């Protein structure tokens, strides 16, 4: 008697993995194919807590979404994050946990300087999107929030909780807008509507960045996504994922395995048939 096989999940392109491949093909391989573990940064944990708290906030009736309620959701949000990754309970010291939660509350307080969540209801929060493009490229990702106006216009919203240093701010904004256009293309092909507005909410800086794409721009960007996926597939067939040294290497946790730093990557496991979002 043969044991049942797990259902095959098609490899797909996500905003983060597309960014990895553009930054460094070898980094893409380490993250998407080798699945090498990476310790979560405090910034990532803080961001996860804030996102979870906002998701819980918008699940409440609009009249209940006051600042005091948002702040009270920080601890339950931390519990939700730890429930997904139980090892964090042991890895994060109590003092660090308290610091993270304090910073998360400060970010949520800042959110109310940008929007009033009691005045509207989003269509969805943390919405999973998946769509196949005309050439077979599969896009997959999660959108922080989708708002729909009474007249039908879409607004795509993403919360940014980090604060990039001045020398990296331009790159951070470029990556953020790449992500938003990715979601805009996915929603265009899913719903047949060009999002009227892409909104980035920088909670640490109390800044809002709005952008209105047009159809021609998204069609060009769609071709860019197709080209990235074709390049990934080509590298996947041969295992030729080369490092691309840059200033960003300073933040990479895989330098000991990188040829650019005298390391040797693990044997290439081959292009996976059933791994998650690439």
Task: Name what the model sees in each region.
Residues 1-7, 13-26, 129, 143, ...:
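Anion-coordinating catalytic cores for phosphoryl-, nucleotidyl-, and glycosidic chemistry
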Residues 12, 68, 151, 184-278:
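Metal-dependent nuclease catalytic regions and adjoining charged, substrate-binding loops involved
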Residues 18-19, 23-62, 101, 105-109, ...:
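Nuclease catalytic cores
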Residues 20-28, 48-49, 66-87, 193-203:
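Short, compositionally biased low-complexity segments
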